[in-house]
Design a protein with these regions (language model features):
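DNA major-groove recognition helix of helix-turn-helix/homeodomain DNA-binding modules
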Residues: 47-63
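Flexible helix-coil transition and linker loops at the boundaries of alpha-helical arrays
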Residues: 66, 107-122, 136-139, 153-171, ...
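A short, Lys/Arg-rich alpha-helix, primarily the initiator
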Residues: 1-16
């Protein structure tokens, strides 16, 4: 096995991209930390190392590190919070309050472990709260959500500008925040604004994440949301093109979480373009993928769309 010193690995890639230490570490750690890393005198936390590698477009699966007890607790709590968040979104009303309480208890435990200068962790907590809403169960307003998400991305990218997304480097968690921002604009009815953000975001992923297996789900996710925004703007052919890119990425990397959404949007676009055979086939494919992946909400929405477009009624 060929072994490469981590500091050299990062420095070589940084210089290939023409980046200064300050540009690479902005919002994650201090330049002196990068200098010490490259010289072998210090190793940052695994969370920070992963973020730096992702910003450089490098895979993190070749890097291994021992975790401190605190880092182990933080990683475990993050996974539990993500799991609770997913359960909360799909739970029936009677269960949601109990899950919400459980999640905020875990958030409080995580906040107690967090260092004040751990911007990545604070960012994670902010975007999680946007999904969850307040502790009393009341959702944040759309304007409040936007304010929270912009604050979250600017924790690690202080000069972030929605008009010039490609002027900075991003780790995968930062990509998720920007994706949330674009989705929020779509929810506000500002679909053209959303498409402008998704267009930049997809281009960034295609350029920087070619070598990162861990990012396999990001391109289909962004392509799915981008295609939906284009559909809402009535750019049906462009929406089909973007959705097809997402579909191909799902097949290539074996990541199918966004596939039913992509096929759903493609079915609607085909309907608008008068392609009855193609549209019906895609509706059926999307419906049974929703069923297979336990997506009841998506399946219900698709049933309505299929019935409205073609009078299709799914028996199973």
């Amino acid at each position: 096995m060929h072994t490469v010193f981590l500091g050299d690995y990062i420095k070589t890639r940084r210089l290939e991209l023409g980046l200064t230490q300050e540009e690479l570490c902005e919002g994650i750690c201090e330049p002196i930390t990068i200098s010490r890393l490259e010289n072998g005198r210090q190793t940052p936390s695994r969370n920070n190392i992963n973020a730096l590698l992702q910003r450089l477009g490098l895979p993190g699966d070749r890097y291994f590190a021992l975790l401190s007890k605190q880092e182990q607790q933080i990683e475990l709590l993050k996974k539990e919070i993500i799991s609770c968040n997913v359960r909360h979104q799909s739970a029936a009303a009677p269960e949601r309050s109990a899950i919400l309480k459980e999640t905020y208890e875990k958030i409080a435990a995580l906040e107690a472990l967090a260092d004040g200068d751990d911007h990545l962790l604070r960012q994670f907590l902010l975007r999680t709260k946007v999904h969850l809403g307040r502790e009393d169960g009341e959702p944040y307003s759309l304007d409040e959500k936007l304010e929270m998400l912009l604050a979250a991305i600017r924790l690690t990218v202080p000069k972030f500008d929605l008009e010039e997304i490609d002027q900075h480097l991003y780790c995968m968690d930062e990509i998720k925040v920007i994706n949330q921002i674009a989705n929020l604009y779509m929810e506000m009815g500002q679909n053209r604004k959303a498409t402008a953000i998704f267009r930049q975001l997809l281009k960034y992923i295609q350029k920087h994440y070619q070598n990162i297996q861990e990012s396999a789900g990001h391109l289909p996710l962004v392509a799915s949301n981008y295609a939906l925004a284009l559909y809402k703007c009535r750019y049906y052919e462009e929406a089909l093109e973007i959705a097809e890119q997402g579909r191909q990425s799902c097949v290539k990397f074996g990541y199918y979480g966004s596939l039913p959404n992509l096929l759903h949007t493609m079915a609607q676009c085909r309907f608008q373009l008068g392609d009855e055979e193609g549209s019906k086939a895609l509706f059926y494919q999307a419906y049974y993928l929703y069923r297979a992946t336990d997506g009841p909400r998506g399946a219900a929405l698709l049933q309505e769309d299929a019935r409205e477009c073609w009078g299709i009624s799914f028996a199973y």
